[in-house]
Design a protein with these regions (language model features):
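Active-site mouth loops of central-metabolism enzymes
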Residues: 27-41, 96-111, 132-138
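Active-site groove signature of glycoside hydrolases
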Residues: 118-139
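Acidic (Asp/Glu)-rich catalytic clusters
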Residues: 9, 52, 76-87, 118-122, ...
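Short acidic capping loops at alpha-helix termini that bridge into adjacent secondary structure
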Residues: 15-16, 83-86, 90, 124-128, ...
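Hydrophobic residues in well-ordered beta-strands that form the structural core
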Residues: 59-60, 73, 89-90, 161, ...
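Short, acidic/polar
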Residues: 36-50, 104-121, 169-173
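Beta/alpha (TIM)-barrel catalytic core signal, keyed to glycine-rich beta->alpha loops juxtaposed to Asp/Glu
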Residues: 4, 134, 138-324
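N-terminal binding-site loop/beta-alpha segment at the start of enzyme catalytic domains
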Residues: 1-86
């Protein structure tokens, strides 16, 4: 079974791998991709396999598949009768309708959306409730105060933040202090061998505040799976084919060149590239847990192998050099 670890100083024990449910009924939040991604049968098979492997934190959002992801998780929980064996993360902030009140982190929107998420998930509590991103139009004190109210009411056990830079995280922590509020348990940001700098600059803030850091997209949106090649178009239906804009400022061509070197390093070590890339992120002292998004139970099994791969600081540094285009090898 995948081992558990404490999420910062929250007192919440979580597995070191979370099941990312962003492909259930869609590909993340964009409405134009609703209905793509995994079907319900696949989603149920993934949740069955994840729980059996100890990957018992399911990470979703109100906006994934337009609510379908939460709904399928709720149906699965009801059919399996395992609510007390599973931890749930969901999120709020992304648009859920056309109007300005249908998004963001205002007290009204958070209150409305947490109730909608509870209904879809068929549960009376959310273990970890995340702000899906910053909301420049709402005072941070209003957002933190609302999360604090929900914790005190028992509606959510813990809350967290996502997609913040250092200034945003520090502003949130200042608001926590000024309100004497419950602090966030978690920061969830992108972090991988191909996307390291911005999140690693936050690790010291998280450590000082007792916040656990969870990394989403530890395979860089699938680039570190090895399924994409620099000289070939992306496979039909893949994330790169459907959401080429989802890679932000990352130069995909340069990244795929680096992936060739990383794949060679994985082959020399005798492990799959995705497992090596996940192990690199998981062995970072600043990282608590990773979100994984397998598309089949077999992929889940191969990703879980990452928890048994041990990397020294030297080996981790050599993988970074390869990711930056240095041809030196992991075994010297």
């Amino acid at each position: 079974l995948v081992r558990d670890v404490m999420l910062g100083e929250s007192g919440l024990a979580v597995p070191v791998l979370f099941l990312g449910c962003g492909n259930f009924g869609g590909i993340g939040s964009p409405p134009e991709l609703y209905g793509l991604g995994d079907d319900k049968e696949t989603a149920f098979a993934l949740m069955d396999a994840a729980l059996a492997a100890g990957v018992r934190m399911f990470d979703t959002a109100n906006s994934y598949g337009g609510g379908v992801s939460e709904d399928w998780i709720g149906q699965w929980l009801a059919s399996r009768g395992v609510r007390d064996e599973v931890l749930l993360t969901t999120k709020v902030a992304s648009p859920m309708g056309p109007g300005p009140e249908d998004r963001g982190l205002s007290r009204r929107h958070i209150r409305t959306q947490v109730e909608a998420s509870l209904r879809r998930l068929r549960t009376d509590r959310i273990d970890l409730y995340l702000a899906h991103g910053p909301d420049e139009s709402t005072p941070i004190h209003e957002t933190i105060g609302t999360f604090d109210e929900l914790v005190r009411a028992g509606t959510i056990a813990h809350y967290g933040l996502s997609n913040l830079d250092r200034a945003g995280l520090e502003q949130a922590m200042t608001a926590v202090d000024e309100l004497n509020a419950t602090g966030p348990a978690n920061l969830q940001n992108a972090y991988s061998l191909l996307d390291r700098a911005e999140s690693s600059a936050l690790f010291d803030v998280c450590a000082r505040a007792g916040i656990g850091f969870t990394a989403y997209s530890p395979l860089a949106g699938g680039l570190l799976t090895g399924k994409y090649r620099a000289d070939q178009p992306p496979p039909p239906g893949s994330r790169l084919a459907l959401r080429p804009d989802a890679f932000g400022t990352l130069n995909v061509d340069d990244a795929l060149t680096a992936v060739n070197g990383l794949a060679a390093a994985a082959e020399r070590r005798g492990v799959p590239l995705p497992a090596l890339a996940l192990a690199w992120a998981l062995t970072d002292p600043g990282v608590t847990a990773l979100l994984i998004g397998p598309r089949s139970p077999a992929q889940l099994t191969s990703m879980c192998a990452a928890v048994d791969i041990e990397l020294t600081e030297t080996e981790r540094a050599e993988l970074v050099r390869i990711a930056e285009g240095d041809p030196r090898t992991i075994d010297g």
